[in-house]
């Protein structure tokens, strides 16, 4: 009887894993489940099954991407840069056409508001990045995708230098 009780406690304690904080950006904790959620959503966006395992290198890139999105969302708010709600709604509808999306939303128990907030952050990041590229290469100056990638990478690094970033080990 006691063995059964201990087994029950062990099983139930395994059902709800603790959140592991993998980083902090300006005192905002970033959890491992956020890395996994973002990774699954990136897989879905690229028409890859969401449960496809994430390599350690990809997890690091995802963490940087999360940092970048948070920073740009804050900068957009400060600069009063927004995206049209109709665009957010239309993008949400497009995401919902993906065969994996309903299961993703159910798995992470996302409300409609939370789902649209995720999409809105992506759209704001895209808009801020487009604005930055247009400033760096004005009047349609010719440039390669590599030039663009390098400029964005430098921008990300400079933005990160101005933040309080702590990175812990990732499972």
Question: How does the language model describe each region?
Answer:
Residues 1-13:
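Sec-dependent N-terminal signal peptides
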Residues 106, 125-171:
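A C-terminal, polar beta->alpha supersecondary segment
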Residues 7, 19-20, 163-165:
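Residue-level marker of intrinsically disordered, low-complexity segments enriched
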Residues 14-119:
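N-terminal targeting/tethering segments
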Residues 121-123:
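Cell-wall glycan
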Residues 8-11, 75, 131:
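Hydrophobic membrane-targeting alpha-helices
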Residues 4-5, 40, 141:
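Intrinsically disordered, low-complexity regions
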């Amino acid at each position: 009887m006691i063995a059964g009780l201990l087994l029950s406690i062990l099983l139930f304690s395994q059902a709800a894993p603790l959140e592991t904080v993998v980083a902090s950006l300006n005192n905002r904790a970033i959890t491992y489940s956020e890395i996994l959620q973002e990774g699954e959503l990136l897989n879905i966006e690229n028409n890859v099954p969401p449960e496809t395992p994430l390599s350690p290198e990809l997890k690091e890139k995802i963490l940087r991407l999360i940092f970048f999105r948070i920073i740009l969302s804050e900068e957009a708010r400060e600069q009063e840069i927004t995206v049209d709600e109709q665009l957010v709604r239309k993008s949400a509808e497009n995401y919902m056409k993906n065969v994996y999306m309903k299961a993703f939303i159910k798995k992470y128990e996302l409300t409609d508001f939370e789902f649209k907030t995720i999409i809105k952050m992506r759209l704001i990041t895209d808009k801020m990045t487009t604005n930055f590229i247009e400033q760096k290469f004005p009047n349609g100056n010719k440039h390669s995708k590599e030039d663009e990638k390098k400029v964005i990478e430098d921008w990300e690094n400079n933005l990160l230098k101005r933040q309080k970033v702590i990175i812990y080990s990732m499972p």
